[in-house]
Design a protein with these regions (language model features):
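Asp-box/WD-like beta-propeller blade repeats and closely related beta-sheet repeat scaffolds
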Residues: 74-123, 127, 133
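A short beta-strand motif characteristic of beta-propeller blades
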Residues: 34-49, 98-105, 146-147, 170-177, ...
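Blade-loop segments of beta-propeller domains
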Residues: 30-76, 80, 85, 99-105
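A short loop-to-beta-strand structural motif that recurs across blades of beta-propeller domains
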Residues: 22-25, 85-88, 134-136, 205-207
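Beta-rich, blade/repeat-based domains predominating
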Residues: 1-7, 48-66, 105-124, 154-195, ...
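Short loop/turn segments immediately following beta-strands, especially the blade-tip
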Residues: 140-145, 208-221
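Beta-strand-rich domains and repeat architectures in extracellular enzymes and scaffolds
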Residues: 1-22
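Conserved beta-strand positions in repeat-built beta-propeller and related beta-rich domains
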Residues: 12-18, 61, 69-73, 78, ...
Length: 236
Protein backbone atom coordinates (compact mmCIF):
# COMPACT_ATOMS: atom_id res chain seq x y z
CA UNK A 1 0.00 0.00 0.00
CA UNK A 2 1.18 3.53 -0.79
CA UNK A 3 0.38 6.97 0.63
CA UNK A 4 1.78 10.46 0.08
CA UNK A 5 2.08 13.55 2.26
CA UNK A 6 1.01 17.05 1.29
CA UNK A 7 4.61 17.98 0.45
CA UNK A 8 5.13 14.95 -1.79
CA UNK A 9 6.86 12.45 0.48
CA UNK A 10 5.92 8.87 -0.39
CA UNK A 11 5.53 6.00 2.06
CA UNK A 12 4.67 2.35 1.44
CA UNK A 13 4.09 -0.88 3.30
CA UNK A 14 5.67 -4.11 2.06
CA UNK A 15 3.30 -7.08 1.86
CA UNK A 16 4.07 -9.78 4.40
CA UNK A 17 3.90 -12.51 1.77
CA UNK A 18 6.84 -10.83 0.02
CA UNK A 19 8.74 -9.93 3.12
CA UNK A 20 12.02 -8.12 2.62
CA UNK A 21 14.32 -6.29 5.00
CA UNK A 22 11.63 -3.74 5.90
CA UNK A 23 7.87 -3.66 6.45
CA UNK A 24 7.41 0.11 6.19
CA UNK A 25 9.50 2.35 3.95
CA UNK A 26 9.86 5.90 2.68
CA UNK A 27 10.49 6.01 -1.06
CA UNK A 28 12.93 8.68 -2.21
CA UNK A 29 13.90 10.00 -5.67
CA UNK A 30 16.03 7.69 -7.75
CA UNK A 31 15.95 4.02 -8.68
CA UNK A 32 15.65 1.57 -5.77
CA UNK A 33 16.13 4.42 -3.31
CA UNK A 34 14.27 3.89 -0.06
CA UNK A 35 14.84 3.65 3.67
CA UNK A 36 13.04 1.93 6.55
CA UNK A 37 10.53 4.13 8.33
CA UNK A 38 10.50 5.31 11.06
CA UNK A 39 13.74 3.41 11.78
CA UNK A 40 15.41 0.02 11.56
CA UNK A 41 14.17 -1.04 15.00
CA UNK A 42 10.49 -0.86 14.02
CA UNK A 43 11.39 -2.90 10.94
CA UNK A 44 13.12 -5.62 12.93
CA UNK A 45 12.45 -9.35 12.77
CA UNK A 46 8.69 -10.01 12.99
CA UNK A 47 7.68 -11.27 16.41
CA UNK A 48 10.95 -10.11 17.98
CA UNK A 49 9.46 -7.47 20.25
CA UNK A 50 6.62 -5.15 21.15
CA UNK A 51 7.81 -2.25 19.01
CA UNK A 52 8.12 -4.14 15.73
CA UNK A 53 5.93 -4.06 12.63
CA UNK A 54 5.03 -7.70 12.02
CA UNK A 55 2.72 -7.36 9.01
CA UNK A 56 2.31 -3.71 8.06
CA UNK A 57 -0.49 -3.26 5.58
CA UNK A 58 -2.86 -0.29 5.24
CA UNK A 59 -1.18 3.13 5.40
CA UNK A 60 -2.62 6.66 5.37
CA UNK A 61 -1.42 10.17 6.22
CA UNK A 62 -3.79 12.59 7.92
CA UNK A 63 -3.92 16.39 7.90
CA UNK A 64 -1.55 16.53 10.88
CA UNK A 65 1.27 14.72 9.05
CA UNK A 66 0.75 11.51 10.98
CA UNK A 67 1.39 8.25 9.15
CA UNK A 68 -1.16 5.65 10.28
CA UNK A 69 -0.32 1.98 9.85
CA UNK A 70 -2.37 -1.15 10.50
CA UNK A 71 -0.26 -4.16 11.51
CA UNK A 72 -2.50 -7.22 11.36
CA UNK A 73 0.17 -9.55 12.76
CA UNK A 74 -0.24 -12.45 10.31
CA UNK A 75 2.17 -14.02 7.77
CA UNK A 76 4.75 -14.57 10.45
CA UNK A 77 7.97 -16.37 9.38
CA UNK A 78 8.91 -19.95 10.24
CA UNK A 79 5.31 -20.95 10.94
CA UNK A 80 5.25 -18.73 14.02
CA UNK A 81 1.85 -17.90 15.46
CA UNK A 82 0.24 -14.58 14.45
CA UNK A 83 0.61 -11.71 16.88
CA UNK A 84 -2.07 -9.33 18.12
CA UNK A 85 -2.98 -6.65 15.56
CA UNK A 86 -2.12 -3.06 16.33
CA UNK A 87 -2.78 0.40 14.96
CA UNK A 88 0.11 2.85 15.15
CA UNK A 89 0.77 6.39 13.99
CA UNK A 90 4.10 8.13 13.46
CA UNK A 91 4.86 11.82 13.04
CA UNK A 92 6.48 11.86 9.59
CA UNK A 93 8.67 14.84 10.51
CA UNK A 94 10.03 13.68 13.88
CA UNK A 95 9.61 9.93 13.18
CA UNK A 96 8.22 9.54 16.69
CA UNK A 97 5.39 7.20 17.65
CA UNK A 98 2.41 9.42 18.48
CA UNK A 99 -0.38 6.84 18.82
CA UNK A 100 -0.72 3.15 19.47
CA UNK A 101 -3.71 0.87 19.95
CA UNK A 102 -3.24 -2.83 20.62
CA UNK A 103 -6.33 -4.80 19.66
CA UNK A 104 -7.65 -7.39 22.13
CA UNK A 105 -6.45 -10.99 21.97
CA UNK A 106 -9.74 -11.95 20.32
CA UNK A 107 -8.63 -10.03 17.22
CA UNK A 108 -5.57 -12.24 16.67
CA UNK A 109 -5.81 -13.98 13.31
CA UNK A 110 -8.10 -11.40 11.73
CA UNK A 111 -6.88 -9.77 8.52
CA UNK A 112 -7.18 -6.01 8.88
CA UNK A 113 -6.09 -4.62 5.54
CA UNK A 114 -6.97 -1.11 4.46
CA UNK A 115 -7.88 1.92 6.57
CA UNK A 116 -9.42 5.37 6.33
CA UNK A 117 -8.45 8.05 8.85
CA UNK A 118 -10.46 10.98 10.18
CA UNK A 119 -7.69 12.74 12.05
CA UNK A 120 -9.83 15.74 12.96
CA UNK A 121 -12.49 13.68 14.77
CA UNK A 122 -10.12 10.97 15.97
CA UNK A 123 -11.65 7.93 14.25
CA UNK A 124 -10.04 5.25 12.10
CA UNK A 125 -12.10 2.88 9.93
CA UNK A 126 -10.47 -0.44 9.07
CA UNK A 127 -11.53 -3.16 6.62
CA UNK A 128 -11.13 -6.69 8.01
CA UNK A 129 -11.21 -9.14 5.10
CA UNK A 130 -10.77 -12.26 7.21
CA UNK A 131 -13.14 -15.21 7.52
CA UNK A 132 -15.62 -13.00 9.40
CA UNK A 133 -15.41 -9.76 7.37
CA UNK A 134 -16.08 -6.52 9.19
CA UNK A 135 -15.47 -2.81 9.41
CA UNK A 136 -13.54 -2.11 12.59
CA UNK A 137 -13.95 1.36 14.06
CA UNK A 138 -11.21 2.70 16.35
CA UNK A 139 -12.02 5.69 18.54
CA UNK A 140 -8.57 7.16 19.21
CA UNK A 141 -10.01 9.64 21.69
CA UNK A 142 -11.09 6.87 24.06
CA UNK A 143 -8.81 4.06 22.84
CA UNK A 144 -11.66 1.68 22.05
CA UNK A 145 -12.59 -0.39 19.02
CA UNK A 146 -15.85 -1.87 17.71
CA UNK A 147 -16.81 -4.16 14.84
CA UNK A 148 -19.61 -3.87 12.29
CA UNK A 149 -20.14 -7.33 10.79
CA UNK A 150 -22.71 -9.82 9.49
CA UNK A 151 -23.89 -7.57 6.65
CA UNK A 152 -24.14 -8.51 2.94
CA UNK A 153 -22.19 -5.42 1.86
CA UNK A 154 -19.08 -6.83 3.53
CA UNK A 155 -19.08 -10.12 1.63
CA UNK A 156 -17.20 -11.01 -1.55
CA UNK A 157 -19.18 -11.30 -4.76
CA UNK A 158 -18.79 -14.24 -7.12
CA UNK A 159 -16.59 -12.16 -9.41
CA UNK A 160 -13.05 -13.01 -10.50
CA UNK A 161 -10.23 -10.53 -9.99
CA UNK A 162 -8.16 -10.28 -13.18
CA UNK A 163 -4.51 -9.25 -12.87
CA UNK A 164 -2.46 -8.88 -16.07
CA UNK A 165 -5.04 -10.94 -17.93
CA UNK A 166 -5.02 -13.82 -15.44
CA UNK A 167 -7.42 -14.80 -12.66
CA UNK A 168 -6.11 -14.03 -9.19
CA UNK A 169 -5.77 -17.35 -7.38
CA UNK A 170 -5.42 -18.01 -3.65
CA UNK A 171 -4.82 -21.34 -1.88
CA UNK A 172 -7.81 -22.88 -0.10
CA UNK A 173 -7.71 -24.69 3.25
CA UNK A 174 -6.28 -27.75 1.49
CA UNK A 175 -3.55 -25.79 -0.23
CA UNK A 176 -5.14 -26.02 -3.68
CA UNK A 177 -5.24 -22.88 -5.79
CA UNK A 178 -8.67 -21.48 -6.61
CA UNK A 179 -10.11 -18.13 -7.75
CA UNK A 180 -9.79 -15.55 -4.97
CA UNK A 181 -12.93 -14.43 -3.16
CA UNK A 182 -11.80 -11.59 -0.91
CA UNK A 183 -14.49 -9.63 1.00
CA UNK A 184 -14.39 -6.01 2.15
CA UNK A 185 -10.99 -4.48 1.52
CA UNK A 186 -10.91 -1.02 -0.15
CA UNK A 187 -12.21 1.66 2.20
CA UNK A 188 -12.03 5.46 2.16
CA UNK A 189 -13.68 8.63 3.43
CA UNK A 190 -15.12 11.62 1.61
CA UNK A 191 -13.06 14.81 1.85
CA UNK A 192 -15.29 16.17 4.63
CA UNK A 193 -15.16 12.89 6.57
CA UNK A 194 -18.94 12.52 6.55
CA UNK A 195 -19.30 9.54 4.19
CA UNK A 196 -17.56 6.18 4.35
CA UNK A 197 -17.09 4.26 1.09
CA UNK A 198 -16.13 0.58 0.94
CA UNK A 199 -16.41 -2.59 -1.12
CA UNK A 200 -15.11 -6.12 -1.58
CA UNK A 201 -11.87 -6.80 -3.41
CA UNK A 202 -13.79 -9.39 -5.40
CA UNK A 203 -16.84 -7.44 -6.43
CA UNK A 204 -18.28 -4.74 -8.64
CA UNK A 205 -20.34 -2.86 -6.05
CA UNK A 206 -19.19 0.25 -4.16
CA UNK A 207 -21.12 0.98 -0.95
CA UNK A 208 -21.49 4.15 1.09
CA UNK A 209 -22.77 4.96 4.55
CA UNK A 210 -22.81 7.87 6.94
CA UNK A 211 -19.57 7.90 8.91
CA UNK A 212 -21.51 9.54 11.73
CA UNK A 213 -23.53 6.36 12.20
CA UNK A 214 -20.30 4.43 12.79
CA UNK A 215 -18.97 7.08 15.17
CA UNK A 216 -22.16 7.19 17.19
CA UNK A 217 -22.34 3.42 17.28
CA UNK A 218 -18.83 3.26 18.69
CA UNK A 219 -19.80 5.55 21.56
CA UNK A 220 -23.28 4.15 22.14
CA UNK A 221 -22.11 0.57 22.62
CA UNK A 222 -19.60 0.57 25.51
CA UNK A 223 -18.90 -3.17 25.27
CA UNK A 224 -19.28 -6.11 22.92
CA UNK A 225 -19.76 -6.13 19.17
CA UNK A 226 -21.33 -3.24 17.31
CA UNK A 227 -24.53 -4.56 15.70
CA UNK A 228 -26.37 -1.30 15.12
CA UNK A 229 -29.19 -1.93 12.65
CA UNK A 230 -29.23 1.75 11.77
CA UNK A 231 -25.78 1.34 10.19
CA UNK A 232 -27.02 -1.50 8.01
CA UNK A 233 -30.05 0.55 7.03
CA UNK A 234 -27.83 3.51 6.11
CA UNK A 235 -25.67 1.54 3.68
CA UNK A 236 -26.37 2.32 0.03
Amino acid sequence: NVTASRDGRIFASVHGMRRGSAQLIEIQPGQNNWQPFPNAEWNGKPGSGKNVLNSAHGVAIDSQDRLWVIDHGNWMPNDAKPTRPKLVAFDINTRELVYRYDFPESATGTIMQDLAVDGERGFVYIADCGSNPAIVVVDTNNNTSRRFENHPSLQAENVDAIVEGEKLLFPNSEGKMQPARVPVNPITLSADGDTLYFGAMNGETWYSASAKSFREGASDYPSGTLRDRTIGAAIK
